[in-house]
Amino acid sequence: MEIERKWMVTGWPEGLPLEEEFTMRQGYISVQPTVRIREEALTGGSTDYILCFKSAGGLAREEIERSIDKDLFVQLEEKIIGKPLIKKVRRSYRLPDGAVLEVNHVDEGLPTAFWYAEVEYPTVEAALRWQPEACGLAAYLNNEVTNQPGQSMGAYWAQTRG
């Protein structure tokens, strides 16, 4: 189960310790239900290829991820998807309460480029209880879109590549 809240933001946060950075490319075989491939390249580290399935939902939804090899990723990208993949840079920051803030810059340089941030939680109750103010992020995380239709990466794919 994936339990996360999402906010639209305007850049990288200031004053938080950077844990890691990934350069990603992702594409969708299907938007409903979500069937996605993703290439995740850790800055200074390894590259992973992931096939992901997600159920419908906002705050909480089922998610199944499986590692795939590069050859299968390329075949799915070229022969099944056949469209330019979404490019993302993701930076992860450890928050004072121990949670991790993931900030994403999507399709940098394109007219449709945007930023968003997510925090994942162990339970729905923890997600509903968590407040950005508690970590000094009230000004940064002030535009929550967790349960708003059209705010998923799948919706962005459909709008820009569909």
Question: Where do the PLM segments sit?
Answer:
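Phosphate-end processing signature that detects enzymes handling 5′-triphosphorylated RNA
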Residues: M1-G162
